[in-house]
């Protein structure tokens, strides 16, 4: 597979609602969109890094520089027979998994199309629909939270995840648990706590949470292992997992009993497959996380979530929850708590180019010649 050309864009999409977490508020999403061209085909990748390094260290500006000045010049015009060859081409460059993932996932789409197969089959998936839940940002009040939770349960979502932080945790989770005693309920702290908050976190054991996600520092494993020994509630690791090596160490330390997989955070599908294999061998359940993706990233996530190790409902909920209009033609919508995987070869979605043009802030076309 020879990569003949690439088009890189920065898009800005307004969210339909204010999304608050422990580290800030989002009302719009900046998206890095990559189109790869080769052998008459097009592969699509989407970057989910943010303008500021609030989730992980990587940013839109940094990823744009690496793709435009380093990664794409290194692969344009090269014959890359498979994604492993692309991985080897990028291996000299340390870190930056989110920037690498944009290129790698676009290449996976291109490669699957060249094979004439849907991506989920190429990855080893076993289903054509994925169980999904919703991730709810911090609401203005407990009463508002209860109303939003009730609406999403009525829509059929199979898991409710609430964002929490010190001062917005036990009481809101207790209210939801009492109102919906049979709901699958989880909490996501986005690194808002430390071991000094042990007493607060132990109180959450009363609430029958399916797990508490990333309670401690974004790059930590050791303290999560200490905390897990104190809690009956499983800890789910998110930000701390940046690749298969970190996953291996997390398993050895006992730092978490559940893993959140985000291919964009891990460096793409290849590294996600390696994490999947480690987790399966250790008996650790996986679920597909979300980063407020538009249609390209959402489609990639759905294809990966068809692998057998993904046994818990993920965050890949309906696109219409987030956007008045998406960047792809296909409607990616859940029904009765299930998201169908897009049909067709590759990731199975096509850009809605007139809309993409309207929301483009910057673009550059690069060719091998």
Curated annotation (Swiss-Prot):
Cofactor(s) listed: a divalent metal cation
Q: Which UniProt keywords apply?
A: Isomerase, Lyase, Magnesium, Metal-binding
Cofactor detail note: Binds 1 divalent metal cation per subunit.
Q: Which Pfam families match?
A: MR_MLE_C, MR_MLE_N
**What reaction gets catalysed by this protein?**
(1R,6R)-6-hydroxy-2-succinyl-cyclohexa-2,4-diene-1-carboxylate = 2-succinylbenzoate + H2O
Catalytic positions? 163 (proton donor), 262 (proton acceptor)
Record-listed E.C. numbers: 5.1.1.-, 4.2.1.113
Q: Which InterPro entries match?
A: Enolase-like_C_sf, Enolase-like_N, Enolase_C-like, Mandelate_racemase_C, Mandelate_racemase_N_dom, OSBS/NAAAR
Query: Per the UniProt entry, what are the Gene Ontology biological process annotations, in alphabetical order?
Result: menaquinone biosynthetic process
Positions binding Mg(2+) in this chain are 188, 213, 238
GO MF annotation, one: isomerase activity
Q: Which NCBIfam families match?
A: menC_lowGC_arch
Q: How does it assemble?
A: Homooctamer. Tetramer of dimers.
What does this gene product do? Acts as a N-succinylamino acid racemase (NSAR) that catalyzes the racemization of N-succinyl-L-phenylglycine. Also converts 2-succinyl-6-hydroxy-2,4-cyclohexadiene-1-carboxylate (SHCHC) to 2-succinylbenzoate (OSB). Catalyzes both N-succinylamino acid racemization and OSB synthesis at equivalent rates. However, NSAR activity is probably the protein's biological function, because menaquinone biosynthesis genes are missing in this species.
Family assignment from sequence similarity: Belongs to the mandelate racemase/muconate lactonizing enzyme family. MenC type 2 subfamily.
Name-wise, this protein is N-succinylamino acid racemase
Q: Which organism is it from?
A: Thermus thermophilus (strain ATCC 27634 / DSM 579 / HB8)
